Amino acid sequence: MSSHAPASSFSVSGLLAYCRAGFEKELAAEIDDLAADAGLIGYVRTEPGSGYAAFETFEPVPVIKLGEFADWRKPVFARQLLPWFDRIDDLPERDRARPLVDMVKGSGQRFSGVVLETPDTDEAKQRSGFCRRFTEPLTRELEKVGALRLGKPGFPVLHVMFPTATSAWLAAGLKDRCAPWPMGIPRLRMPSNAPSRSTLKLAEAIMTLLSDEERDSLLRAGMRAVDLGAAPGGWTWQLAQRGIRVTAIDNGPLRDTVMATEMVEHLKADGFTWRPQRPVDWMVCDMVEQPSRIASLMAEWIATGRCRHTIFNLKLPMKRRLEAVEQCRELIRKRLASIGPFDLRIKQLYHDREEVTAYLTLKK
């Protein structure tokens, strides 16, 4: 294949996905289903605690065949989803660049950039310094052989993922199909006056679950929101910082920094039984409760028009976690079936632990 081949005719060997360590089983099941939907024939490979899973096809396939199924937003437990085209298990210690360059050149695809990364595990993250140091020399060698055209529109980004010091996966980051952050992890700083780290969870949910256009149009100053189970106020504070007036529902206290925004009304009430007198733009919820109960409550608020949009968190059981997510999907589907089409997006965020975060709204 010519090195001038367009990305659409580029052949790949499957899908590579990153996840939170410990959720490889759930991720593997999801990408196995994605591969089946895309008509791929092959198998999933993963190891417990590795922080990633891969689907490997029996024969290379054109990347265009993956189509919409290669979109990182689809699998709940994937932080990143990439078509991969080669891998190596015996990288030499001294000249790691040469075999990697040869594999990239052999793929017949040019790339517009290079991202070196590791799985998000304590062991693998020890190689983050190596990735930073190795990026420049690898970039230089790829440019020498014509495999890299930095910033060239239409070319994918080369991802090189090192699960160990001597092994690597080579994958292609397709525009608008892969997560835009290295390792699929948004870099967020904890604001000094935020009441709790949970504020980062809502900030990441807004970054991850909403598009740029949706963030601009759906989160405007002057809107009204409700936060169910608000204490100590991390999610309420995040909304208030965006100029949104919040009614915070919780029998527990809110931090002084939350009330200092002067954008918050705190009502001591039960988040499951309280209802607003008139509809609001947003309802958010991070209550610790069975996921099915939360999902039913969220669907009820949307179905009755009490809110237009909701972002909520689902705490997962230790076992059958993917099944719990699917049960929540079905509960929401049944409640909204007679109301109209809806948009439900679910992701396990970097700031989620044994949980996932979701966005729900009715489609216009």
Swiss-Prot record:
Record's keyword annotation contains Cytoplasm: yes
Keyword S-adenosyl-L-methionine on entry: yes
Primary localization class, coarse: cytoplasm
Annotated S-adenosyl-L-methionine binding sites: S198, A231, P232, G233, G234, D250, D270, D286
EC number from the UniProt entry: 2.1.1.186
Gene3D superfamilies named in the record: 3.30.2300.20, 3.30.70.2810, Vaccinia Virus protein VP39
Position of the signal peptide: none
Catalysis: reaction(s): cytidine(2498) in 23S rRNA + S-adenosyl-L-methionine = 2'-O-methylcytidine(2498) in 23S rRNA + S-adenosyl-L-homocysteine + H(+)
InterPro entries recorded: RlmM_FDX, RlmM_THUMP-like, RNA_MeTrfase_FtsJ_dom, rRNA_MeTrfase_M, SAM-dependent_MTases_sf
Molecular functions (GO terms): S-adenosylmethionine-dependent methyltransferase activity
Disulfide bonds: none
Subunit structure and binding partners: Monomer.
Job of this protein: Catalyzes the 2'-O-methylation at nucleotide C2498 in 23S rRNA.
Protein name: Ribosomal RNA large subunit methyltransferase M
Species annotation: Azoarcus sp. (strain BH72)
